[in-house]
Regions:
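Conserved radical SAM core fold
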Residues: 68-71, 102-105, 116-135, 161-166, ...
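Residues lining hydrophobic/aromatic ligand-binding pockets adjacent to catalytic sites
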Residues: 73, 116, 133, 137, ...
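Conserved C-terminal portion of the radical SAM core fold
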Residues: 141-204, 254
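Auxiliary Fe-S-binding modules of radical SAM enzymes
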Residues: 180-263
Length: 263
């Protein structure tokens, strides 16, 4: 169970990702690089989802993209297209996935039945360039979000992960200004926002030091504290300041768009 955007996180047609985001937990699962692994029992998995959805007294939402970026996977397998069209036949429920990619063209003409929710993960372009190697640009992501909304999909924005680099206030101010300027009013009225702060770990540090020795260093002991086994998160006072700053920016620039959670 999840109870943020979705009711359940479910493993689906792939795990891993060929992008190289420096903070991603998938890298730790593979102990150096997060290669893409495909699963071939998609019919069994979707059948279980649809049976669970249709047995429920109300609509359930299933997060199918927590172990991979399904839009990237779709460029190889076509699994996301197949899933969207088949789940459209369900009498109840929704599927949802986040993405950092803009290759949505194959999804636009599909019969989705209003049962698929795409959440576009965004960050300031300098952070994308420095931390999210191999992913789409911010401009491309915003364009893809607009295209999916125009095709009738439910859409959301995931500001994630929030990374507190030296000039983070300026970077996130520019991000939210760009969203305010480029998103059409109709889309804004139907949008929701999620905010997730970065969690890091000593395993990330070791992997990144070897694989990307010249990359930006994400661990900052002046800002971070231990959390669980070998994990780091921003100190509560630092985190609270950043939350308030982001909420104020969103209120000023994107007033009325609900922020459904901050973690």
């Amino acid at each position: 169970p999840n109870h943020k955007v979705s009711d359940f996180l479910v493993p689906y047609t792939s795990s891993g990702c060929s992008a190289m985001c420096l903070y991603c937990y998938l890298v730790c699962n593979y102990n150096k690089c997060s290669y893409l692994r495909l699963f071939v029992n998609r019919e069994q998995m979707l059948d279980k989802l649809m049976k669970t959805a249709n047995r429920s007294p109300g609509d359930l939402t299933f997060e199918i993209g927590s172990n991979s970026d399904l839009l990237l996977e779709n460029s190889i397998s076509g699994n996301l297209e197949w899933t969207i069209e088949n789940f459209a036949g369900s009498k109840k429920g929704f599927i949802t996935f986040p993405t950092k990619f803009d290759m949505v063209e194959a999804l636009l003409p599909l019969n989705h039945g209003g049962r698929t929710i795409m959440r576009m993960s965004v960050n300031p372009q300098p952070i994308i360039q420095r931390l999210e190697f191999g992913t789409s640009s911010l401009t491309g992501r915003i364009r893809a979000l607009q295209q999916m909304h125009a095709a009738g999909y439910k859409v959301g924005i995931l500001i994630a992960p929030v990374v507190l680099l030296d000039n983070w206030q300026e970077l996130y101010s520019q991000l939210i200004e760009q969203l305010a300027d480029e998103l059409p009013d109709k889309l804004k009225k139907e949008l929701f926002i999620e905010i997730i702060f970065m969690t890091y770990s000593y395993i990330h540090r070791a992997i990144n030091a070897e694989a990307f020795p010249n990359a930006v260093k994400l661990y900052d002991k002046s800002l971070m504290t231990g959390r669980g086994r070998g994990k780091y998160c921003y100190r509560s006072d630092i985190r609270l300041q950043a939350e308030e700053y982001l909420k104020e920016l969103l209120e000023q620039k994107l007033n009325g768009i609900p922020v459904i959670y901050i973690v």
